[in-house]
């Protein structure tokens, strides 16, 4: 993992393609261009890059193609990407790592730089008194829940997740 380190988090890019979303992506891609010009470094994504991410075996959420393409270009240019999965995108089952080359983490990521230990965390569920969310998190990450959720068609789960996303 080489410096410089570029850290982004909680972008919540949406699947829909309206002017607002196109403008947000254009700004991000300018940042990516600056990273590529530097020619080296590590991009650390602290979770919730996507507003919703759930993989089926043959299907990933549509509408993210340009984002995935730009992340792949960064990797092809020699930029390492580390992704701490957040509460909106933790249902990655290997696509980001196998198909793009992103190193993914289901929880915190720790590394050393200049004799300092650095911890990157998404932070969801850190509050001990947030009982409701902590219970919800255990349920939606449970393998049985995921198996049941995968029985529904992708369009249904995408629509449901968009509604849930607005409340978290």
Regions found by a protein language model. Give the residues of each.
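Acidic, histidine-bearing metal-coordination/catalytic regions of metal-dependent phosphoesterases
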Residues: 1-4, 158
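Core catalytic region of metal-dependent phosphoesterases/phosphodiesterases
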Residues: 3-4, 8, 13-113
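Short hydrophobic-aromatic micro-motifs
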Residues: 7-8, 117-121, 128
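Contiguous hydrophobic, core-forming segments of folded domains
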Residues: 108, 115, 127-129
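Active-site-proximal loop/helix segment associated with metal-binding centers of metalloenzymes
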Residues: 123-168
